[in-house]
Amino acid sequence: MSTPPAPAPPLLIACALGIERLALRLGERDGTGGPVTVLRTGMGPEAAERSVARALAGPALAGVAVLATGFCAGLAPGMHPGDLVVAEETRDPRGSVPCEGTDLLVEELARAVPGHAVHTGPLTGTDHVVRGPERARLRDAGAIAADMESAATLLTAARAGTRPVAAVRVVVDAPEHELVRIGTVRGGISAFRVLRSILPAFREWHRNVLLPRR
């Protein structure tokens, strides 16, 4: 009798806000691509680091792929709420973490939410909401978007062991479309709808990064 294959390791999706977790749960379609755990970390880099480190310390999530997602501030002129950002790397003052499967994510996201622009480049981490002139400074340093948790999430995941990592964010405000309060303006609603639609792309990324290297 042949031995059944071992179950695929799960995908850990980390987000900061309850509204982000709600969007992901509403968007779940089926179980293809392996099991998924959605972790709400809380806001800010310190909360993300604590929450992810605690999750990865347990045996149930040992060796899992980690994907950071949620909303972000777009830094490049011409970005709009609902645009997507696929990080080539995440960075903060402690260093940078390269992301895996960027091209595949771009392809799958374009299929999941046709008509929404997908931007690629460095995603920078901050410890506060960025506005006005600070956006320009971060853009001049090479980043295309900013958020408070992705860099801390991926750095913590990388330090916990070798694993695939990625970050995908939905632009909720941009230089020409600054957001006052998430969920109260059109930009926030648009970003929520996009986030609700992209879990299938994450599952496909996960399925592919689990394939043996050639």
Predicted feature locations:
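Short, well-ordered secondary-structure micro-motifs
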Residues: 24-25, 78-79, 97, 131-136, ...
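Glycine-rich beta-alpha junction loops
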Residues: 17-18, 73-75, 127, 152, ...
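Conserved active-site and cofactor/substrate-binding residues in soluble primary-metabolism enzymes
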Residues: 19, 43-50, 104, 148-152, ...
